[in-house]
């Protein structure tokens, strides 16, 4: 694989995720025509285009939500198959959708553990889905996740998500994606519904995520801020 070069002519880090020649049709509509890109660890790659350019289609293919007609994916130089959301999750590929997919009637801690709630010891005679949730461990994990992302505007992980600001909700959705042993995180227009101050906070958070050696894909329209 040919290495990329940065602005001073030094070899850039090797690609962590490589996408080659992805094609997708919806009937007579050719949504993707040989999409190619690559992103290294500790790098933010901006996927920028107008409505209808195929950004969301490509993102959903990577997340395993859409089938595709042709194309290849490589992770750490190894060819991988992505045919379902479970495949993507097993490879460490996570997505933060624009609608965030949060449960507004649950608190922050419950949202961060949704689907992987810690259970109390001593209940092994019951199926896991019937065991009581260890709320103290769930709260501790949520606090740790929020602290790692340096979300300073959130007063309590027991706050209901429905009462949070747009920037706080975005932070919770990002924390949930990052907390699943992910190596690639896709952000679907994370600043689209935010004001100037909240946009700045989210972009600063993306910077901090980059410094944790994640591969980040920032999906944006040309009119929205996406520089890091």
Which residues make up each language-model segment?
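Glycine-rich phosphate-binding loops of nucleotide-dependent enzymes
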Residues: 2-220, 224-225
């Amino acid at each position: 694989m040919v290495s990329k070069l940065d602005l001073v002519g030094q070899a850039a880090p090797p690609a962590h995720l490589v996408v080659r020649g992805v094609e997708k049709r919806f009937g007579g509509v050719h949504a993707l025509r040989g999409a190619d890109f690559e992103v290294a660890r500790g790098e933010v790659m901006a996927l920028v285009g107008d409505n209808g350019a195929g950004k969301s289609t490509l993102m959903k293919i990577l997340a395993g939500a859409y089938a595709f007609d042709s194309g290849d994916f490589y992770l750490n130089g190894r060819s991988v198959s992505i045919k379902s959301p479970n495949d993507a999750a097993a490879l460490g590929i996570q997505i933060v959708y624009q609608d965030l997919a949060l449960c507004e009637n649950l608190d922050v801690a419950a949202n961060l553990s949704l689907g992987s709630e810690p259970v109390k010891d001593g209940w092994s005679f019951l199926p896991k889905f019937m065991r009581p949730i260890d709320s103290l461990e769930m709260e501790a994990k949520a606090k740790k996740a929020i602290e790692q992302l340096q979300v300073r505007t959130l007063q309590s992980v027991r706050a209901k998500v429905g009462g949070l600001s747009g920037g706080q909700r975005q932070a919770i959705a990002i924390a949930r994606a990052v907390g699943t042993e992910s190596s690639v995180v896709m952000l679907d227009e994370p600043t689209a519904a935010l004001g100037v101050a909240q946009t700045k906070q989210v972009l600063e958070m993306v910077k901090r995520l980059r410094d944790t050696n994640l591969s980040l894909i920032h999906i944006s329209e040309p009119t929205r801020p996406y520089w890091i």
